[in-house]
Design a protein with these regions (language model features):
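Acidic, surface-exposed loops and disordered segments
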Residues: 1-224
Length: 224
């Protein structure tokens, strides 16, 4: 089975999980995640960081209000520069899907955590945009209702299979409160991806663009 097919299957298997067991993440899993994060940071210019065995970020009223429990590991999405939220979404989701392949569960988190400065290395000019809770879930999560292909995409004439498959994969991507405020438009041999305004919609756009690439079997040069 090729790597793209494995990732496509991973997309279908992954669901958001908010309650975790106290099982520590295995050392070899931590190493694999750190290796991927190092490569992503070198490619993207971001400063993503894996934090393990640190429960303070989710020990707050808002975290409990968001029904998070047992979270002591997370991916911190940190960086600077243009289109920061979108880039964090695009590259952060790559770590999320690797974590799923390695047996972990996850949940993208916007504002229900507190920044633990001592656990993070935030340099001058950098911003913490969000975190992703990681760990061994008490459950595997559940699927949620998604929009139809026609609600989030458009093209002139018959829709090519590759474009349809890209949109289908994007519809399985996590978005803030399942809002799916994105749209794909086929323009010849290019695709325009846009997001209407909503909380975290730019980060969502990065996530769904990566999903589209996986489903369609294309690279980032597809974008108009």
């Amino acid at each position: 089975m090729d790597s793209i097919k494995i990732l496509q299957d991973t997309v279908k298997a992954r669901h958001s999980v908010r309650q975790y067991t106290d099982q520590p993440i295995a050392n070899e899993v931590v190493t694999a995640l750190q290796d991927r994060i190092k490569a992503i940071n070198a490619e993207s210019g971001l400063h993503l960081q894996l934090v393990v065995n640190e429960p303070q970020a989710f020990d707050s009223f808002m975290a409990h209000y968001g029904k998070f429990s047992g979270v002591s590991n997370y991916l911190a999405l940190i960086g600077s520069g243009d289109r920061l939220d979108e880039r964090c979404g695009y590259y952060g989701e790559q770590v999320v899907l690797l974590a799923q392949q390695l047996g972990l569960n996850s949940c993208w988190v916007g504002m229900t955590f507190k920044k633990v400065v001592s656990a993070l290395d935030i340099r001058r000019g950098e911003k913490l945009t969000a975190v992703v809770a990681l760990g061994y879930g008490q459950t595997q999560g559940v699927s949620h209702k998604v929009k139809t292909i026609s609600e989030v995409s458009s093209c002139q004439g018959a829709m090519p299979d590759w474009f349809r498959q890209g949109v289908e994969c994007a519809l399985l991507a996590p978005t803030a409160v399942n809002q799916q405020k994105f749209r794909f438009e086929l323009l010849g041999d290019k695709v325009r991806a846009t997001a209407s305004w909503a909380p975290f919609s730019k980060m969502d756009l990065g996530i769904v663009k990566y999903h589209f690439e996986l489903g369609a079997g294309v690279g980032p040069d597809i974008w108009a």
